[in-house]
Design a protein with these regions (language model features):
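A short helix-breaking turn/cap at a secondary-structure junction
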Residues: 152-237, 296, 300, 435-441
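Short glycine/serine-rich loop segments
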Residues: 72-188, 390-399, 406-409
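Glycine-rich, small-residue loops and helix-cap segments
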Residues: 39, 190, 248, 277, ...
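Short, well-ordered beta-strand elements within core beta-sheets of diverse protein domains
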Residues: 55-59, 171-178, 317-322, 412-413
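Residue-level signal for inorganic ion chemistry
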Residues: 6, 39, 183, 216, ...
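Short, well-ordered alpha-helical
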Residues: 1-60, 64-65, 87-90, 199-202, ...
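Flexible, glycine/charged-enriched surface loops at secondary-structure junctions
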Residues: 19, 196-202, 245-254, 345, ...
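Short basic, glycine-rich beta-strand/loop surfaces that mediate nucleic-acid
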Residues: 98, 262-268, 407-417
């Protein structure tokens, strides 16, 4: 299925786009039925796993994350681990400690993040599927920027065993592909209970149905602050959906504006506890001065090998969990999360899905990203954070292009455990929308 020539092509396109942190050295897939890649925060026994961080450089796991194991069990061959924002902290994959993946439609622009390498691989490698991970938008954002389909399932639908955690109550393993049919095909593979991940054990069985999205709610708040290009593409997509028989209703969901601050409190709080394990002893870098005391040694390792965004979020999360601040911030953020969930549930009583643009703008240039403040970067996630905070399944589909041929996506959100509606929509939309592909080299 692949040979030395194919491996050479993979190496060459990786030099152009930088989507892989590590590529397979095997020139023959043997009996593999399909090829796939995985975000570098899913551990794999034959690839270094770094989660985009120097502090994990040199970490070689002895087991596969459950989603990778299930893909391999279905006949797949893992061809590489994809570049990402360090520990998933970012919107543009520009916070990688290694190589920053480049957008396949314009290499001066971002792939999105934090699963940017996975989206790029899905876009430029023909007949490919990639495992991604979403915490606050890390599947749908890069799917939108790279013009592919991306699905983040219900929280708990796919096992997180073997995932380098960002936020335990937020992380979801999903899929990215240029062919929407692959999302349904491989969601059947990776979904399901796993005794090693208790959060996956309460789910109903994953079943595909013939049910379709027939009515969608479009929140006014979600289209107020998007760019003109995104607005035009989204409105055109609404017209196309109506021609497919989908009923469109404009609604108000004022609760959505509270999702961002609540998300960053919860995500940073959980991240700061998860990252406490990286101290230069059990995983990755272990080159500190062993004559130092524990505090000095840990501080030295973390200061040298954590990136600036990681340090920022650790400090933020530690602050929100401090005595005297926990009730003021963390507990209140949990209450806001329930408000967001209730707001979605209200819409799902009369609609099959909530529909918004995926991102408020097209992929920015790296030179513009470097000028953004942290707050401006965080605000870019305003449309992808709400469904992630609610733990609801969501799908990004390509829906248009700007004057520079940069992709624009739209995001469907359905009720918990209703991935079937999203997967059917992806296939239906794929038959009616003329998707443009970048130069496919493999």
């Amino acid at each position: 299925m692949t040979d030395a020539d194919t491996l050479s092509k993979l190496t060459r396109i990786n030099g152009r786009y930088g989507m892989f942190h590590r590529l397979t050295a095997e020139a023959d897939t043997g009996d593999a039925d399909f090829l796939f890649s995985a975000k570098d925060n899913l551990v794999s026994k034959d690839f270094e796993t770094t989660a985009g961080s120097r502090i994990l450089e040199g970490y070689h796991p002895v087991f596969d994350a459950t989603p990778i194991a299930r893909m391999r069990g279905a006949g797949g061959m893992l061809i590489g681990k994809t570049n990402m924002d360090e520990f998933g902290f970012g919107t543009f994959s520009a916070n990688s400690a290694f190589e920053v993946p480049k957008n396949p439609f314009d290499t001066d622009r971002s792939c999105g993040g934090s699963s940017g390498g996975s989206a790029c691989a899905a876009a430029v490698i023909d007949d490919h599927v990639s495992l991604g991970v979403s915490t606050g938008g890390s599947i749908c954002c890069p799917a939108s920027f790279c013009g592919v389909y991306g699905i983040a399932p219900t929280y708990g639908r796919v096992s997180r065993y073997g995932l380098v955690d960002y936020g335990n109550s937020l992380d979801k393993v999903g899929l990215l592909a240029a062919d929407p049919a692959k999302l349904g095909r491989y969601m059947r593979v990776i979904a399901g209970r796993d005794e090693r991940d208790p959060t996956s054990c309460a789910q109903p069985d994953f079943e595909m149905t013939n049910c379709r999205i027939e009515a969608v709610a479009v929140p006014d708040e979600a289209v107020e602050n998007v760019s003109a290009d995104v607005s035009r593409a989204f409105e055109s997509a609404l017209e196309s959906l109506q021609s497919m028989g989908v009923e469109i209703e404009r609604v108000s969901m004022p609760e959505l504006k509270y999702a961002m601050p609540a998300y960053y409190v919860l995500a940073a709080s959980e991240a700061s506890t998860n990252l406490a394990r990286y101290v230069g002893m059990r995983y990755g870098k272990q080159d500190g001065d062993l004559t130092q005391g524990f505090d000095e040694y840990f501080t030295s390792i973390r200061s040298r090998y954590f990136g600036e965004e990681v340090k920022r979020r650790v400090l933020l999360g530690t602050y929100t969990r401090m005595a005297g601040f926990r009730d003021r911030y963390y507990a209140k953020a949990l209450q806001v999360r329930m408000l967001i969930i209730d707001a979605y549930r209200k819409q799902f009583r009369t609609h099959d899905a909530v529909l918004t643009p995926t991102m408020p703008f097209v992929s920015p240039r790296f030179e513009d990203i470097s000028e953004m403040s942290p707050i401006e970067t965080y605000k870019a996630d305003c449309l992808t954070v709400p469904p992630n905070l609610a733990g609801a399944p969501h799908l990004s589909c390509p829906c248009g292009y700007d004057e520079n041929c940069m992709p624009i996506g739209m995001q469907f959100v359905t009720d918990h455990w209703r991935e079937d509606l999203l997967l059917n929509m992806a296939e239906d939309w794929g038959k009616s929308f003329d998707v443009r592909r970048p130069e496919v080299l493999i």
